[in-house]
């Protein structure tokens, strides 16, 4: 049976592993390295370079060297994050045919999935060279906080690379698999994963082959690239102060600054001071200019202090969702190259109150976990049960723009959930199902994933048709949505297509700001709910007044009409208390009408019973008569 490989498709570096007997093993690439830079370049003569060869020529070919493309995968071109990235990278980010953020290299527009596919192909070739056989199936890792669009785009990249992606697995979960495969005792662990472009925190219970994710949180635009860019900005500012030249306008100089920043960042993890020397960085009328600067670890830490702190809020949220305190975590596993930074280790120790576990290789552990998952799917690894979760709540927009959750965040996947909704208008023949992802109370404040129409609903009063909406999330975290008219059996199903990823601002809006905005959200939701109830009450009161108005006095009819008018006016405003008060007033004014309706229905019921009794009496005679006829018929037929 052909091997299934495990791939960690990283922002900065990628890694590949396989199961070698009962142990996962990292495979070295053609250059003899255990990780491969996630960089693709098109050289001057049109040659495609991937990995280390692409990185080596980046300084001389910055416009055609694509790096950190994972941060663009599944994102729209008009996304604020894309705008931010455009200012920081030397290559061109352009608008794709579908409105997504694409890149341009060698004069050709390509999607992030295509660039990622080139990196995956390099991984595939590495495995084939080692195994001596064709490789067609893989398990690929993604950040736990990747949304549906980003997961879809990653799966597409695998397909483009000629791989059947058997499973998309979350990076922290993969790391936990590698860490805990040989652990028999039950433990609660936190995986703190700060990589090149993304940050994830996952809380898991592991033991005796069961890996259950309790909660996950993160930031899809926070990683080593941001630390590098912060240092690039500092170096450029210092040079401008000294020489009066802005290096950020020079793409060649910018690429040299980036390389120097990355090197300095790595050096400062093991030393307290480093020197940056960039001779002939630029030139002006007075001659060539050189950049020479001493950088201390303390200075670097002060430059990135806010980035380090940004990892703490997701940690708090993950613990809260898991119902745990920091002291209840038995072990904190560090994943991702950035966790080698002493400041990161220090803040993790402060927050969790214990030394983080450093027994795993932060660059390789995710790929090792992916290989274990591949082994599980292939049947080579027995007695391992992995229970992962969906990172964000999923739901639809309902009357008044409310976000109605069908699947809450941190629900174990795969999962399926259905809920019955109805129409908002009389004789409504179609409904639009708008699918959202997020944590805010109003749909507009969340991320729109897609929409579709269910048509052909038979005309009926509002609230009568029954439309069943079903959300289905598979083990890859990819969403399917269907809507079915229970009356006609008509069904419409879609797999949510990649319509752009979640931006940094979007993520903050969804989760981090959710609590800060909880009060506002609560008020807005209360208004919408009060308004919906008011409209239903107005509708039923007007209908009742029309049918039974003649059963009450003129004064009572006027009082009900006035109460309806007052409630309609209140419903146009934003005061939930006022709407509720006017609703109560209408309910009280309509009590006489309700009494009249009840008396009328009782009278109708009594009349119906009397008719039924009379019919029963006459039926007795008819029955005797018919029975004789029946016997006659039988005799005739005999």
Curated annotation (Swiss-Prot):
Molecular function GO terms recorded: ATP binding; ATP-dependent protein folding chaperone; unfolded protein binding
Protein family membership: Belongs to the heat shock protein 70 family.
Chain positions with Phosphothreonine modification: 198
UniProt KW keywords: ATP-binding, Chaperone, Nucleotide-binding, Phosphoprotein, Stress response
Induction context: By stress conditions e.g. heat shock.
Highest rank taxon of the organism: Bacteria
Organism: Mesorhizobium japonicum (strain LMG 29417 / CECT 9101 / MAFF 303099)
Protein name as it appears in the record: Chaperone protein DnaK
PANTHER family membership: HEAT SHOCK PROTEIN 70KDA
This protein's encoding gene: dnaK
Classification via PROSITE patterns: HSP70_1, HSP70_2, HSP70_3
Region spans: Disordered: 598-638
Amino acid composition bias (Acidic residues), ranges on this chain: 620-632
Leader sequence segment: none
Gene3D superfamilies reported in the protein's UniProt record: 1.20.1270.10, 3.30.420.40, Actin, Chain A, domain 4 (3.90.640.10), Substrate Binding Domain Of DNAk, Chain A, domain 1 (2.60.34.10)
Annotated coiled-coil segments of the chain: none
Extent of Basic and acidic residues compositional bias: 601-619
General function of this protein: Acts as a chaperone.
Disulfide bridge partners, by residue number: none
Presence of keyword Oxidoreductase: no
């Amino acid at each position: 049976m052909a091997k299934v490989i495990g791939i960690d498709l990283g922002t900065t570096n990628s890694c590949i592993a396989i199961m070698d007997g009962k142990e996962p093993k990292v495979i070295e690439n053609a250059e003899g390295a255990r990780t491969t830079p996630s960089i693709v370049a098109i050289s001057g003569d049109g040659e495609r370079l991937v990995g280390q060869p692409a990185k080596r020529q980046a300084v001389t070919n910055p416009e055609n060297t694509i790096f950190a493309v994972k941060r663009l995968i599944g994102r729209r071109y008009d996304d604020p994050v894309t705008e931010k990235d455009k200012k920081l990278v030397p290559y061109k980010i352009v608008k794709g045919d579908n409105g997504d953020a694409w890149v341009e290299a060698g004069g050709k527009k390509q999607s992030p999935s295509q660039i990622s596919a080139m990196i995956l192909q390099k991984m595939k070739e590495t495995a084939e060279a080692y195994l001596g056989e064709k490789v067609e199936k893989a398990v690929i890792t993604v950040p736990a906080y990747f949304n549906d669009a980003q997961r879809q785009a990653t799966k597409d990249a695998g397909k483009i690379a000629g791989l059947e992606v058997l499973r998309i697995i979350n990076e922290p979960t993969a790391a936990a698999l590698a860490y805990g495969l040989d652990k028999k005792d039950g433990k609660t662990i936190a995986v703190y994963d700060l990589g090149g472009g993304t940050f994830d925190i996952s809380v898991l219970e592991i033991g005796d082959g069961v890996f259950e994710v309790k909660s996950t949180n993160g930031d899809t635009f926070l990683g080593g690239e941001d630390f590098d860019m912060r240092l690039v900005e500092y170096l450029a500012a210092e040079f401008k102060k000294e020489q009066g030249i802005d290096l950020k306008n020079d793409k060649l100089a910018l690429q040299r600054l980036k390389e120097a920043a990355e090197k300095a960042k790595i050096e400062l993890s093991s030393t307290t001071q480093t020197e940056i020397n960039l001779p002939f960085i630029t030139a002006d009328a007075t001659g060539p200019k050189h950049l020479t600067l001493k950088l201390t670890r303390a200075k670097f830490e002060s430059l990135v202090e806010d980035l380090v702190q940004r990892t703490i809020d997701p940690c708090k949220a993950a613990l809260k969702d898991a119902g745990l305190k920091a002291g209840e975590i038995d072990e904190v596993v560090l994943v991702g190259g950035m966790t080698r930074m002493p400041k990161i280790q220090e803040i993790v120790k402060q927050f969790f109150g214990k030394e983080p576990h450093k027994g795993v290789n932060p660059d390789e552990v995710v790929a090792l976990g992916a290989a274990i998952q591949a082994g599980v799917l292939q049947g080579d690894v027995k007695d391992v049960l992995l229970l992962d979760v969906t990172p964000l709540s999923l739901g639809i927009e309902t009357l008044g723009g409310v976000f109605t959750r069908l699947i809450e965040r941190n629900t174990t996947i795969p999962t399926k959930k259905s809920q019955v909704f109805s129409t908002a208008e009389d004789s409504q023949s179609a409904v639009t199902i708008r699918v959202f992802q997020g944590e805010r109370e109003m749909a507009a404040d969340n991320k729109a994933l897609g929409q579709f129409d269910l048509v052909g609903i038979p005309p009926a009063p509002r609230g009568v048709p029954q439309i069943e909406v079903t959300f289905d999330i598979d083990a890859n975290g990819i969403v399917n949505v269907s809507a079915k008219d229970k009356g006609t059996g008509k069904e419409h199903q879609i797999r949510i297509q990649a319509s752009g990823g979640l931006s940094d601002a979007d993520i903050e809006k969804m989760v981090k700001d959710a609590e800060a905005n909880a009060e506002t959200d609560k008020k807005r939701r209360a208004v919408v709910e009060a308004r919906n109830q008011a409209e239903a009450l107005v509708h039923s009161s007007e209908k009742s007044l029309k049918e039974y108005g003649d059963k009450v006095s003129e004064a009572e009819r006027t009082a009900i009409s006035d109460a309806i008018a007052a409630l309609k006016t209140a419903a146009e405003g934003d005061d939930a208390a006022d709407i509720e008060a006017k609703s109560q007033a209408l309910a009280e004014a309509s009590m006489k009408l309700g009494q009249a309706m009840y008396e009328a229905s009782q009278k109708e019921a009594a009349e119906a019973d009397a008719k039924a009794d009379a019919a029963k009496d006459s039926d007795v005679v008819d029955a005797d008569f018919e029975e004789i006829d029946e016997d006659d018929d039988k005799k005739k037929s005999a």
